[in-house]
């Protein structure tokens, strides 16, 4: 996960570190064996295999595995939790050297380059403060060049109000468009029912934007 809340960055680092220290990869509610909808949306952008892609809050997610499997060669994963990143590195083994790993709070991070695809599944909905959402949007604007793509998956308006002991803010494509401003045009939005490892269905929305200017 990646982001800041009123409880503070250091406390959030401790929180997520404890989550990944005390639970197995398959024991967290957001676990996906195969991140099918994320992959489908990334494919829909039409970017080439050498396109720079960043996964925000990617931590222990298996999206990076799938991107490497599909031949993408410029993948970056950013997460607030070093423990989550370590889980992915261990799972990938030697292939982890093909990925750039960044442990950082996305709301304070300064992008070192631009990306053709910015993907975020679940990190954004943990930003409960308006100033943190604004800081996130500023990073997106700096990191995604005109013509680039932004994919954000969050709990939908009828989704959970909390996750892993933390409050979340639920979104739809309209609320995301309002936060992102006029530089990003909505291309598509999808509703998604995620079934947790415990069998609970959580309602998500995924929105794909293209930077227009």
Residue ranges of predicted features:
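Conserved acidic residues
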Residues: 116
């Amino acid at each position: 996960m990646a982001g800041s809340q009123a409880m503070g960055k250091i406390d959030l680092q401790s929180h997520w570190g404890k989550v990944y220290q005390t639970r197995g990869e398959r024991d967290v509610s957001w676990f996906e064996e195969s991140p099918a909808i994320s992959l489908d949306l990334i494919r829909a952008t039409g970017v080439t295999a050498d396109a720079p892609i960043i996964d925000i809050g990617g931590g222990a997610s298996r999206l990076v595995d799938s991107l490497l499997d599909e031949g993408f060669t410029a993948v970056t994963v950013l997460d607030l939790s070093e423990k989550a990143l370590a889980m992915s590195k261990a799972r990938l083994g030697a292939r982890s050297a093909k990925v750039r790993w960044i442990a950082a709070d996305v709301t304070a991070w300064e992008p070192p380059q631009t990306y053709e695809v910015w993907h975020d599944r679940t990190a954004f909905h943990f930003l409960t403060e308006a100033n943190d959402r604004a800081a996130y949007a500023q990073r997106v604007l700096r990191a995604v060049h005109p013509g680039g793509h932004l994919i954000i998956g969050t709990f939908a308006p009828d989704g959970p109000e909390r996750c892993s002991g933390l409050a979340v803010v639920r979104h739809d494509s309209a609320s995301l468009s309002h936060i992102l401003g006029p530089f990003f045009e909505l291309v598509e939005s999808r509703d998604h029912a995620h079934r947790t490892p415990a069998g609970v269905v959580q309602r998500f929305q995924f929105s794909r934007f293209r930077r227009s200017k």
